[in-house]
Amino acid sequence: MVDAAPSRPAGRAPRPGRTVGARQLAALLPDPAGARPAYRHLAQALSTLILDGRIALHATLPAERELAVALGTSRTTITAVYDLLRESGYAHSRQGSGTWTDLPEGRTPRGISRLIGPQDTAIDLARAAPGLPQQTLVDALTQVAPQLAEHAPTPGYHPYGLPDLRAAVAERFTRRGLPTLPEQILVTSGAQHALTLVIGLLCRPGDRVMVENPSYPNALEALRRAQLRTVSVPVTDEGWDIEIIESTLRQVVPQLAYLIPDFHNPTGFLMPERERVRTLRAAARSGTWLVIDETLADLALDVPAPPPFASHATPGGTGQVITIGSMSKTHWGGLRIGWLRAPARLVTELAGQRVATDMGGSVVDQLLALTLLAQAGDLLPARLEQLRRQRAALAAALAEHTPQWTWRLPPGGLSLWVDLGEPVASALAERALEHGVRIESGAYFATDPGLFEQRLRIPYTTPADTLREAVQRMATALADDLTVRSAARRPHWVA
């Protein structure tokens, strides 16, 4: 239910240029004929979209008449929807400015709550990120402590990253088959920071960027905030369609392409070598910068770990390939250390841009990362074996409690991309929370409205017993009366 919020002054005015079209919004909403009363059903769905970030805050909503036409309902119904949103704090209106989205007092956007985790006893399957064994962290801190004495007398600013860490990351690339110099490495505060720096330097508002669909939501949000136009290429149950990738690069000529070829998030798929080669060649012909997200590349569970994407380029052909990596998925997200590999000249420009925002990363975190990378030969095999056990436990629990769901066991990564067989994922995610499980609807990973409502991303990063309990709770939630969303059956809005 949409609960009424205490009266308060109208929220901040809508952001100029940030609007939600009637057809775009209709593609995200359920069929108003699917429940009674329709206005309350639509208001609940709309508040959920605002809360989880699929509709931006302070964005202008369509006029009542336009939305009524797009949904095939009466204007009276939409008027009641907007009234209920205003009463509950999810919208505000002003003469001449229309109606725009907001959050009630005390509510946190789910983009933030996904990261900080549940503040209750719910099982958290919204974050595909493992924890770090306590003793591993304690031992690493013990080793790092004496090294801090060397750095304490210095200012501590390293916009390029600690020289030793840059060298270690470069050596890691070289060992994996891509000769790399320390000058080609920029240490960042995580992979997301690396992507944001690249976008800020190479792109301008309105530029086109090729992305996979589905893709990593935080990357899509970074592109949206930079006012870039995404052009999506599908990742289906059969993997990537290289012909669509080639034709998109040839016809659209995007400024940048963001790809996750190694145990793709959320599907877990691994791009074959021949498709990597063809992608590199097509990007070289179009002059497109390739940004390759390798944060999951080490998490190979059933196959050998893949070599770097850029290693498949022709000699001298890696000039427009940027590779992003991180400690978050292999070690711990609390260690805010990532990196990018790029031509040395570009690294210099990126470091210059970085100084305007954060001056450089934490010396302590970088020393910890250096210590953990040196121990990766011992730590990583244990991590992989743990993930294999947990993946098997999740698959067995799904087969037992939800046999109607289907999935493909990924060769690596951190999650299953589960097909529910009907577009109820968002409704199930809401109902599962009532049963004590936080889970992500596939729609959160979509580049276009109305897609992947039949999918859930279920990580296997928590203990096996917890996964089994979570699946049992989801099965109980599934037995409830879920309203089937009709968005997948409507033509989705296209920019």
Predicted region positions:
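N-terminal basic, amphipathic alpha-helical segments
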Residues: M1-P146, A351, V355-G361, T406, ...
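Structural signature of PLP-dependent enzymes
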Residues: P153, L350-T357, L372-A395
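Short hydrophobic/aromatic beta-strand micro-patches
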Residues: R341, W417-G421, P459-T461
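Conserved glycine-rich beta-strand-loop-beta hairpin in the small C-terminal domain of fold type I
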Residues: L387-A395, W405-D419
